[in-house]
C-alpha cells in the first residue's frame, strides 16, 4: 500500500477577496474561499435526495445590497450581491453543470466568428415593458464596459448590433462555445434604476432589508420559494458570522477559506472552472523534460491531495479541461502510478544508482491552504524519488520569482473561461502564463477544439504526452446555508439559483 501523506495545502496564484467585487480578470488574480463535501459535484450531491420527503420553503434571507444591484447589476461592489442579482435579472443563456448553454432570454445560433442572438418573444420586465433586442444589446454594452464584472469574458467580441429581433455579434477569433459566455444580467433603466425580467421582483423596501416576491409574469418555471429577503450587511467582512448567528440564511464563498470549516452550516459545491496546477520552468534541464513532467503527474494522488490539503471541495483532474465538460469523454483522473513515475525518471537518467532529482517548488504564502498543498505535493513526490525544497513567498515576491524564473515548479491557480479558453495557461500576460510552451502540434489541436468544438479528446491525448503544465484539480465554490435549511440545491458559478424552481426542504 502507498504511504499516506499527512500534510495540508493548496495554492492559488491569485488575490482573493472573500466578499469583494468589481472586475475580476481571468488570470492568476481571482477571489475565493469555501468548504463542502470533498470531491463531490453538484450533481452527485443531488443524487442522494431523490427519495427524501420534501416540504416547501416559504422564505429565504440572502446577504445582498439591493441599492447597489439596481444601480448597476454588472458592477455592484459585493460578490453576494452580484450573485443575488440573478434573482431579479435573467441572462441571455443559462449554463449547466456540464458547461452546456441553454436558451434563456435568447437562442444562440452561428459558428466561428459570426453569431446571432434571437430574442425570446413575450418576455416582460417588472415594469410591464416588453423585452426587445435593443435591451439585450444595451445590456451587452454595459457588460463589456470598463469596471464590469463580466468585461473580461467578453473581450473577444469585435462588434455587436441590433437587427430586427436579433443581436448580431462578430468575434475577433472563432469560439465554438461563445454562447457559454452570455451569462451577464439583462436589465433596462426604468425610473432611475435597472429593472429585470427575473424570477423575483421588488415587493417592499425597508431601512435594512428588501423583500422580493415571485414574479407572477415570469416566462420560465416559477421559483419554489415565495419570497426572498435581501439583507444588507453593514460590514461585509462579517458575512460568515452573520450566517453563523442566523442573521442570514445563505452565503456564497469563493475560493480557499479557513472560515467555512468553523461554520455549523450545510453547504453545496458550486461547479467552477477554477484550475489548480503545477507550472514547470522551461529553462531548467529537469522540468524542461516532458518525461519528468509526466513522472510528476504519475506520482501524484490527486484525490488524497484534495482530501488532506484543500479547505474547499474540488474535483481531481490531470487535464486542464473540467471533468464535467460534456464534449470531453477522455477520463480526466489518472490513477497514481509510482512505479511508472520512477521508471520515467530512471529512463531520463535523473534517478537511479548514485543519482537523485532535487526540485524547488515555489508557492504563495497567502491564502488558507497553499502551504498545506505545497507540503503534501512534496511528500507525494518524495515517494517517487524526487526531493522537493519548498519556497514559500508573499504574493509580490512570488510573482517576482515567476518573472525572473527563480523556480523549478510553481503552484498556481487560475479561473478559466466557461468557453474552455485555455490560452491564459501558456500565453504570458499580467500574472499568468508562466512555464513551458506547448508544442505546435498541441497548440493546433487546442485551437481546432476551441474554434470548432470538435477534437477535445485528441487534444487531451496530446496534452498527456507533453504536460506543459500539470493539472491537479478544479476547485468548487461553496454555497452555505444555515442548519435550518437542507435544500435540494444544484448551483453553478454563473447562477447560484439555477434550480430554485425545485428547492425544497429534505426531512
Kindly label every feature range from the protein language model.
Residues 63-111, 118, 141:
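N-terminal lobe/hinge region of extracytoplasmic solute-binding protein
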Residues 78, 170-229, 235-238, 343:
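Gly/Pro-rich hinge or "lid" segments in bacterial periplasmic/extracellular proteins
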Residues 213-217, 267-295, 299, 308, ...:
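A bilobed periplasmic-binding-protein/Venus flytrap-type ligand-binding module shared by bacterial periplasmic
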Residues 159-161, 203-211, 229-284:
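Extracellular/periplasmic solute-recognition and catalytic clefts
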Residues 106-147, 286:
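Aromatic- and charge-enriched surface segment that lines or borders ligand/interaction sites
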Residues 348-416:
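Ligand/substrate-recognition segments at binding pockets and active sites
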Residues 49, 390-398, 423-486, 506-507:
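Extracytoplasmic/peripheral linker and loop segments enriched in polar/acidic and small residues
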Residues 288-379:
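Append "and occasionally in soluble cytosolic enzymes with long acidic Gly/Pro-rich linkers
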Amino acid at each position: 500500500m502507498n504511504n499516506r501523506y499527512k500534510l495540508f495545502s493548496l495554492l492559488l496564484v491569485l488575490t482573493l477577496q472573500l466578499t469583494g467585487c468589481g472586475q475580476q480578470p481571468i488570470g492568476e488574480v481571482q477571489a475565493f474561499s469555501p468548504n463542502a463535501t470533498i470531491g463531490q459535484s453538484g450533481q452527485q450531491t443531488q443524487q442522494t435526495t431523490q427519495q427524501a420527503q420534501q416540504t416547501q420553503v416559504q422564505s429565504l434571507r440572502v446577504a445582498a445590497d439591493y441599492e447597489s444591484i439596481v444601480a448597476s447589476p454588472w458592477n455592484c461592489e459585493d460578490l453576494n450581491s452580484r450573485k443575488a442579482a440573478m434573482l431579479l435579472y435573467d441572462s441571455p443563456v443559462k449554463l449547466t453543470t456540464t458547461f452546456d448553454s441553454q436558451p434563456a432570454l435568447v437562442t444562440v445560433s452561428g459558428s466561428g466568428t459570426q453569431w446571432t442572438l434571437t430574442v425570446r418573444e413575450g418576455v416582460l420586465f417588472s415594469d410591464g415593458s416588453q423585452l426587445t433586442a435593443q435591451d439585450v444589446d444595451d445590456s451587452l454594452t454595459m457588460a463589456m464596459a470598463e469596471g464590469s464584472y463580466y468585461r473580461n469574458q467578453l473581450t473577444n467580441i469585435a462588434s455587436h448590433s441590433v437587427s430586427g429581433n436579433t443581436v448580431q455579434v462578430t468575434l475577433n477569433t472563432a469560439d465554438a462555445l461563445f454562447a457559454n459566455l452570455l451569462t451577464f444580467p439583462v436589465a433596462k433603466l426604468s425610473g432611475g434604476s435597472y429593472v429585470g425580467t427575473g424570477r423575483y421582483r421588488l415587493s417592499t423596501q425597508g431601512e435594512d432589508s428588501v423583500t422580493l416576491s415571485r414574479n407572477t409574469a415570469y416566462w420560465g418555471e416559477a421559483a419554489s420559494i415565495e419570497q426572498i429577503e435581501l439583507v444588507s450587511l453593514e460590514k461585509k467582512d462579517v458575512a460568515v458570522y452573520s450566517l453563523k448567528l442566523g442573521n442570514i440564511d445563505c452565503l456564497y464563498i469563493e475560493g480557499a477559506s479557513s472560515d467555512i470549516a468553523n461554520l455549523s452550516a450545510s453547504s453545496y459545491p458550486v461547479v467552477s472552472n477554477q484550475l489548480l496546477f503545477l507550472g514547470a520552468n522551461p529553462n531548467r534541464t529537469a522540468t524542461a523534460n516532458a518525461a519528468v513532467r509526466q513522472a510528476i503527474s504519475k506520482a501524484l494522488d490527486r484525490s488524497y491531495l484534495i482530501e488532506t490539503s484543500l479547505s474547499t471541495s474540488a474535483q481531481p483532474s490531470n487535464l486542464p479541461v473540467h471533468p464535467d465538460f460534456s464534449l470531453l469523454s477522455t477520463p480526466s483522473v489518472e490513477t497514481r502510478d509510482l512505479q511508472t513515475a520512477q521508471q520515467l525518471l530512471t529512463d531520463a537518467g535523473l534517478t537511479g544508482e548514485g543519482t537523485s532529482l532535487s526540485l524547488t517548488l515555489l508557492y504563495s504564502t497567502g491564502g488558507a491552504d497553499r502551504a498545506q498543498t505545497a507540503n503534501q505535493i512534496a511528500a507525494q513526490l518524495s515517494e517517487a524519488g524526487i526531493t522537493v525544497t519548498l519556497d514559500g513567498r508573499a504574493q509580490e515576491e512570488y510573482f517576482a520569482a515567476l518573472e525572473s524564473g527563480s523556480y523549478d515548479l510553481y503552484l498556481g491557480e487560475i479561473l478559466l473561461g466557461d468557453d474552455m479558453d485555455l490560452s491564459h495557461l501558456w500565453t504570458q500576460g499580467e500574472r499568468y502564463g508562466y512555464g513551458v510552451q506547448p508544442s505546435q502540434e498541441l497548440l493546433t489541436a487546442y485551437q481546432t477544439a476551441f474554434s470548432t468544438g470538435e477534437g477535445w479528446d485528441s487534444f487531451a491525448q496530446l496534452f498527456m504526452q507533453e504536460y506543459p503544465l500539470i493539472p491537479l484539480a478544479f476547485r468548487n465554490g461553496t454555497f452555505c446555508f444555515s442548519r435550518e435549511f437542507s435544500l435540494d440545491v444544484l448551483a453553478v458559478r454563473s447562477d447560484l439559483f439555477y434550480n430554485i424552481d425545485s428547492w425544497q426542504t429534505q426531512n
